Amino acid sequence: MQKSEGFRSKTRYKLSKHPRQKGLFPLTRALKCYTEGDTVHVVIDPSVQKGMPHPKFHGKTGTVVSQRGRAFLVRVKDGGKYKDIIARPQHLRESKL
């Protein structure tokens, strides 16, 4: 049987929530606005499928380049290259540094 190569493959633990965190996210997280140059962490919320970046970017840190509708364009370093990913604010956290 051939291996499945879907968007969420090999994410059994990465895209799962602990029992206390299950359920919907706070609405303020969806309404959060970032400005250009803000540093954000990509932390995927598995309860929201829309605007979810690829799971390989989970845990990465990048800078906000611009806004695209409800989502944000974030520039993340992947290996030696910079890649632009589109993610909604539910999947982003503001960096404290």
UniProtKB/Swiss-Prot annotation:
GO cellular component: ribonucleoprotein complex; ribosome
GO-annotated biological processes: translation
GO MF: structural constituent of ribosome
Signal peptide: none
Superkingdom as given in the UniProt entry: Archaea
Keywords for this protein: Ribonucleoprotein, Ribosomal protein
Pfam assignment, any one: Ribosomal_L21e
Gene3D superfamilies hit by this protein: Ribosomal protein L21 (2.30.30.70)
InterPro entries, per database record: Ribosomal_eL21, Ribosomal_eL21_arc, Ribosomal_eL21_CS, Ribosomal_eL21_sf, Translation_prot_SH3-like_sf
Similarity section: Belongs to the eukaryotic ribosomal protein eL21 family.
HAMAP family in the cross-refs: Ribosomal_eL21
Protein name per its UniProtKB record: Large ribosomal subunit protein eL21
